[in-house]
Design a protein with these regions (language model features):
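Alpha-helical segments flanking ligand/cofactor-binding loops in enzyme cores
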Residues: 149, 180-181
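Rossmann-like NAD(P)H-binding beta-loop-alpha module
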Residues: 129-163, 168-171
């Protein structure tokens, strides 16, 4: 809930609404950086996440589902040991079948100097403290293109870099070409067919 689809879609919807508001001001200048803070943008994201979490917990309780917060470790194919988040007594769960559904996490290459100040992954960017004047996004898959659209709608200069010569190489070419056209109209600079060799903070 706290990373991935829900927070990014919440942020995207907020930005899209604000972009629509800007279009409806009939020529009156509306600047994201002057009229809305990063904290205000993130506030709505956090509200949506909390609402979704509360809704899930209510549904779990209604359907007799027990939620255990802790660190699991398999002792055997039928025994799962859990260390509770509050570090209280460890206990075990036995079952005939276990389903492991931990979700995915961003790829973090060892050569990238992630610091959560200037260099972020697709999860930590959701906790950004201020809106930058420009941003470079590495990767033109679904997540990279989504964030390129979000930041460009805020009026932020975006460079989108990818090794492939097309965005979303796994979708129909007509769809990808239309997306590239739309992103260029939003002043996203597409640097396709290029490799990033190093990242340095200056």
């Amino acid at each position: 809930l706290h990373t991935g689809t829900i927070p990014s879609k919440s942020l995207r919807e907020t930005v899209m609404h604000l972009a629509l508001l800007r279009q409806q001001t009939h020529g009156i200048e509306f600047n994201f950086k002057e009229n809305i803070t990063t904290q205000e943008l993130m506030y709505r994201k956090d509200i949506v996440i909390q609402d979704q979490e509360n809704s899930l917990r209510r549904n779990f309780e209604k359907n007799g589902i027990t939620v255990i917060e802790g660190t699991p470790r398999f002792q055997s194919t039928s025994i799962l040991e859990i260390t509770p988040a509050d570090q209280s007594e460890i206990f075990e769960i036995t079952a005939d079948y276990f389903i492991v559904a931990t979700g995915s996490s961003p790829r973090r290459p060892s050569w990238v100097p992630f610091d959560n100040e200037c260099v972020f992954d697709s999860d930590t960017i959701l906790n950004i403290k201020h809106l930058p004047k420009k941003v470079t996004i590495i990767g033109a898959g679904l997540i990279g293109c989504e964030y390129a659209s979000i930041f460009s709608k805020m009026g932020i200069r975006v460079n989108l870099i990818a090794r492939d010569r097309n965005v979303l190489p796994f979708v129909d070419r007509q769809i990808a070409e239309n997306l590239m056209y739309q992103m260029r109209n939003q002043r996203v600079t597409l640097r396709l067919g290029e490799n990033v060799e190093n990242i340095e903070k200056v």
